[in-house]
Regions:
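Substrate-binding pocket helix/loop in short-chain dehydrogenase/reductase
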Residues: 44-57, 155
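Active-site helix of classical SDR
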Residues: 68, 104, 112
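A glycine/serine/threonine-rich, flexible loop-to-helix segment
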Residues: 121, 134-158, 199-201
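Short C-terminal tail/terminal secondary-structure segment
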Residues: 93, 174-175, 186-201
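Alpha-helical segment proximal to the catalytic Tyr-Lys
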Residues: 73, 117-121, 183
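Short, small/polar-rich loop/turn modules that mediate ligand/substrate recognition or access, typified
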Residues: 80, 120, 125, 185-187
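Residue(s) in the substrate-gating loop at a strand-loop-helix junction
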Residues: 88
Length: 201
């Protein structure tokens, strides 16, 4: 409506060839890439068996890596490229029994830090947004609220703000890091969790 070109397609990020094709075709259709946002999850949640770890590696880690690495040549040409990966607060804070989920997501942090330091001379930034519990209709927390109300209440009670986040609050953080407003921010894990974490940094 405002003269902005948009392209879209369904793609399985666990399918390496399909993801690489999607990124390349999107860049071609748009005439390049200035921003790449990776919001990938195999929804491992509470699984701890080897199959869960393998799925997390294929989808969450390789899905992120393949997307970022494929986008890099376009971002380098941009002159002000930005990568934003949506992670989770579970990567920096003990998340109870979700060992596979936390471990897999934690692996993204040093990868993005490495990208940030190596790409800085090429004017490409890389950052992570780490959301806490986010509530939206049809989401996992709505399901937990209905089926496990005590767990839902306990999660709310743990957060000093007394509520869960909203999708738009995560989107705002992503937009900030992707934009020129964050032009001197790179290699940063931005936690968006309502003062939930106990870490000093």
């Amino acid at each position: 409506a405002k003269g902005t070109k948009a392209v879209g397609a369904a793609v399985d990020v666990g399918d390496g060839e399909a993801l690489v094709k999607f990124v390349n075709e999107t860049a071609s259709a748009l005439g390049g890439l200035d921003i790449f946002v990776s919001n990938v999850s195999g929804a491992m949640m509470g699984g701890i068996d080897e199959a869960t770890w393998r799925k997390g590696f294929e989808v969450d880690i390789l899905g992120t890596v393949r997307g970022c690495e494929t986008a890099l040549p376009y971002l380098e040409k941009s002159g002000a490229g930005s990568i934003v990966v949506v992670g989770t607060v579970a990567a920096v804070e003990n998340a109870g029994p979700r060992r596979a989920y936390s471990g897999i997501k934690a692996a993204i942090l040093p990868y993005i830090k490495s990208l940030a330091q190596n790409l800085a001379p090429k004017n490409v930034r890389a950052n992570v947004v780490s959301p806490g519990s986010i509530y939206f209709k049809g989401g996992v927390w709505e399901m937990i609220e209905k089926n496990m109300p005590e767990r839902y209440k306990a999660t709310l009670a743990r957060n000093p703000m007394g509520r869960m986040g909203k999708p738009e609050e995560i989107a705002n953080a992503v937009v900030f890091l992707a934009s020129p407003a964050a032009s001197f921010v790179s290699g940063a894990p931005l936690i968006v969790a309502g003062a939930l974490t106990q870490r000093i940094y």
